[in-house]
Amino acid sequence: MLQDNPLLAQLKQQLHSQTPRAEGVVKATEKGFGFLEVDAQKSYFIPPPQMKKVMHGDRVTAVIHTQKDRETAEPEELIEPFLTRFVGKVHKKDDRLSIVPDHPLLKDAIPCRADRNCEHDFKEGDWAVAQMRRHPLKGDRGFYADLTHFITYSDDHFVPWWVTLARHNLEKEAPNGVATEMLDEGLERRDLTALNFVTIDSASTQDMDDALYVEEGADGKLHLTVAIADPTAWIAEGSKLDDSAKVRAFTNYLPGFNIPMLPRELSDDLCSLRPNQIRPVLACRMTIAADGTIEDDIEFFAATIESKAKLAYDDVSNWLEGAGNWKPESEAIAQQITLLQRVCLSRGEWRKTHALVFKDRPDYRFVLGEKGEVLDIVAEPRRIANRIVEESMIAANICAARVLRDKLGFGIYNVHTGFDPANTEALAALLKTHDVHVDPQEVLTLEGFCKLRRELDAQPSGFLDSRIRRFQSYAEISTEPGPHFGLGLEAYATWTSPIRKYGDMVNHRLLKAIVKGETIARPQDEATVQMAERRRLNRMAERDVGDWLYARFLSDKAGTDTRFAAEIIDISRGGMRVRLVENGAVAFIPAPFLHAVRDELVCSQENGSVQIKGETVYKVTDVIDVNIAEVRMETRSIIARPVV
């Protein structure tokens, strides 16, 4: 009788509209309760029974109840689920399947079944890709998922790689396809096979995409020719291979192996600038003045070359530093190395004065056994040979940026605008507290940004530099020429790695059109969106595999007295993140490990410091000694504590 009563319906509606509600993101804890985080300042407690309706990371609206001055949230409507497609570990009990998502804050098993299109017979411990199908806030009784893909068995030694690639939905192997013959591009190729081109790479590199040759003019100026592998001589625009490269966008470099953008036959053989093999190239010749300036007579052209030597970074560096037994196999190669060093030093000086030079950080290389076990992690400092290649590539990319801008007005550019305009007042205020004075408008110009960077680089520590990082904008990929503040350059367009970057292949096609005097269409903006997204995913995959391998490598150090020097890289309310100097692993030091009395401890992300009883004890960029307290394999996290 009452159910159709309009007055009752109206009353219900009124009550509903008067009940306070909030929208936010669910944050789970390990103790069963959770919080609805509305913004940085406001959060509501979610009791354990209500947490059963939601999952960590869900965006929901909730009814806010007030009892005895305590506010609690009752999740009511799902706005955006945290889990849609995910990876996890399968459990099997009495022929019933469930899956535990591979996420540090998701511990509960979700009932599931194998999807119709997935024919694998799932066993306990298998890794799988799953798709959420049911959610309590959608009116379902509980959570439920379908297993859509089998990833691998629990005892596979390469679980870190396969699970990570599946998580980010990235390819596991090289693309299929062959290129049987070179295209007729109507390009005249200069025969440079007699010149002493050399490649300098890691000893294990197979996909050599750059070769260098220098000669000195009578006036003492250096003429550098950068020859770059030419995959677009084999791959037609719009072909199957081109489409697959466009999707992959980059070769994916993971610890231990890579997944190439192009078929290996091309990347490691036909296009690779192997020694004593004749190869087609796209080349750039530039004149470098005594002070390192690149003069205006930049020339791009097609050619064939024959690399005369595959040199390794360490050998070249040792020889130039007068160490080790290696020496160049001929006087001609020795002369090339010496001239390349001159190019490097003069260009490095020019960039220091007129642009910006990144601080050298070592690369960390995982040494793996046949079963994926980590035998060692080696810090490889950037030495003179690395800098020779880096300076040559940066010079070549500056040339491409200029030529594309002046001849076409477009290309694939790396653009970085420095600071976000919305942040410059706060930036100036922060710097002022450290006696560094900047004009909020001036730092938005390339010149003003470079001036500030040089001032920060001259500081005794990197502390202030680390404080202003949060005000910086991100680098972008754009079809429009624009400045790259991070490098201190007016424009920057890469073309020197076309075997491993699709954007460089696009720039090759544009440069070839200029060489031939033809018109060509501007690249589509969607292509740059795909490149940026793939770059992000590849970086996350590299980090995820690295975290897994670091956890494996350091697990036997947990609870021991082994000391590691560690640089503080971040401070938050909960503690500090540090990077171990000798191997690059990132570890977390919880606040209770810093000081036992919580009220006497202030961990400030804002100030980048930890204070105990009002005294600053730690700050970002400090290097401290730590022990490994614990390694949690299921979350691949390393917990450290300071050595007292």
Swiss-Prot record:
InterPro entries according to UniProt: CSD, NA-bd_OB-fold, RNase_B_OB_dom, RNase_II, RNase_II/R, RNase_II/R_CS, RNase_II/RNase_R, RNR_Ribonuclease
Keyword Hydrolase in record: yes
Function description: Involved in mRNA degradation. Hydrolyzes single-stranded polyribonucleotides processively in the 3' to 5' direction.
A Gene Ontology BP annotation from the UniProt entry: mRNA catabolic process
Lineage of producing organism: Bacteria, Pseudomonadati, Pseudomonadota, Gammaproteobacteria, Enterobacterales
Subcellular locations according to the entry: Cytoplasm
UniProt xrefs under SMART domains: CSP, RNB
Name of protein: Exoribonuclease 2
Stored Pfam families: OB_RNB (PF08206), RNB (PF00773), S1 (PF00575)
Domain S1 motif: 561-643
Domain called RNB: residue spans: 189-516
